[in-house]
Amino acid sequence: MASVQLQNVTKAWGEVVVSKDINLDIHEGEFVVFVGPSGCGKSTLLRMIAGLETITSGDLFIGEKRMNDTPPAERGVGMVFQSYALYPHLSVAENMSFGLKLAGAKKEVINQQVNQVAEVLQLAHLLDRKPKALSGGQRQRVAIGRTLVAEPSVFLLDEPLSNLDAALRVQMRIEISRLHKRLGRTMIYVTHDQVEAMTLADKIVVLDAGRVAQVGKPLELYHYPADRFVAGFIGSPKMNFLPVKVTATAIDQVQVELPMPNRQQVWLPVESRDVQVGANMSLGIRPEHLLPSDIADVILEGEVQVVEQLGNETQIHIQIPSIRQNLVYRQNDVVLVEEGATFAIGLPPERCHLFREDGTACRRLHKEPGV
């Protein structure tokens, strides 16, 4: 195991900057996930740690050693890519041992390492098979095993589940989580799938246009996003946003006017520092935090546009006339409602988020479970 530290790391190709002044501390044994939309720089950041991309400026440390100029083979890292990249003419055992053979390891060491890793990954009964005889999930386990036999200090995974179908992704996600708990290795995992990030990570790094938007535990990012970008990216369906105007402030409270014909006002339990009366802001509320109208004091009403019945839950898209945008309401179980019907939902102030015009969040003061 080893820690990884990035200090003011920047990557640029000519005048195009793809990673901007990145500062990160990844502790020994942590499972850290880099997540963000396509083009945000997450894979580039991983490749700089691996040594596959040079660092334009800043410093990278693995353990206590500065690694900027160290060749990839000497960094003590192992990498798994989206593509399995297995040799089709070699057996599972031969694929897993290929790197050790190139390194000149003794046969008994190779056999011991391959057999040990095969047991961990439940591949022992498949060691004699060729890749074409394996399922997608088994091939990905072989690719992971090939990296593990080299005993890297840091394990890097670049979107390893993207080529798998939905059921296999769930299965492999569970297996990777179990593998980390069993081995205790430092793992850095890249994905654009925020569900993978939420379920796997000890710590999530959200990237936006080459910058670190927020670093934190999964529930911390879900309940207390630092800005509107993180709020909209973490969570599915994504957070609803409403334009509001500040009408009053008090200690640890901000009153806003909702964009409804009755101009209803509501006090939100958020930090009021630097919030000015009359300011235009955005109120955020997650679909699953909206309430049935009969148990709420603050009511929003609109026309049902789309009803998505998922069996275990219902997602209702409601158009609010005064703002000409849809809100998504999510409720467990089946909700029977027709498209075109008028539908009312409740807005719980304590579950609301408030964002300034520059996108930064006013700190929420409501204590959420698990954070």
Curated annotation (Swiss-Prot):
PROSITE patterns: ABC_TRANSPORTER_1, ABC_TRANSPORTER_2, MALK. ATP binds at G36, P37, S38, G39, C40, G41, K42, S43. The keyword Cell membrane applies. Disulfide bonds: none annotated. It catalyses: D-maltose(out) + ATP + H2O = D-maltose(in) + ADP + phosphate + H(+). GO terms for cellular component: ATP-binding cassette (ABC) transporter complex, substrate-binding subunit-containing; maltose transport complex. The keyword Cell membrane applies. Pfam families: ABC_tran, TOBE_2. GO terms for molecular function: ABC-type maltose transporter activity; ATP binding; ATP hydrolysis activity. It comes from the Bacteria. It is found in: Cell inner membrane. Keywords: ATP-binding, Cell inner membrane, Cell membrane, Membrane, Nucleotide-binding, Sugar transport, Translocase, Transport. CDD domains: ABC_MalK_N (cd03301). Belongs to the ABC transporter superfamily. Maltooligosaccharide importer (TC 3.A.1.1.1) family. This is Maltose/maltodextrin import ATP-binding protein MalK.
